[in-house]
Amino acid sequence: MREIRLVPQGKALFALYLQKEPDGNIRGSFLPENSGKPVTFASLSRMVLLMEEAMDVPQESGERPIVQTPDFEVEILFRRNSTWQGILRRPGFRDGQNFRSVLELLTLLESNMAV
């Protein structure tokens, strides 16, 4: 039997800092909302695994360090098993792009980085 994990609305927010390599690979780091420690990743698939781990660990309380404006913000509204639903936003823009799965999130990130 699979464990069911739900994240209440607004509980998981990540600031993403991305860089596209000459070979097309996207790497970077993210900063969980309630943590002062950035997490680096070498691919989008690794990013997903590390974000999943970050949502399973209680976050530290305290102030978020002042850093540069992120490329994107990912808000996970619902999470059940390995399925995420949420919003991908660019800072400074009011509206975001909704996603209903991790695959949709990755597709949105890839298409936004191609621009």
Predicted region positions:
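Intrinsic disorder/low-complexity detector
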Residues: 1-14, 22-24, 49-82, 115
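Canonical SH2 domain fold
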Residues: 15-18, 27-32, 74-76, 84-90
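Mixed-charge, glycine-accented linear interaction segment located at domain edges/termini
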Residues: 30, 35-39, 50, 88-115
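Short, low-complexity cationic-aromatic patches
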Residues: 7-12, 19-23, 38-45, 80, ...
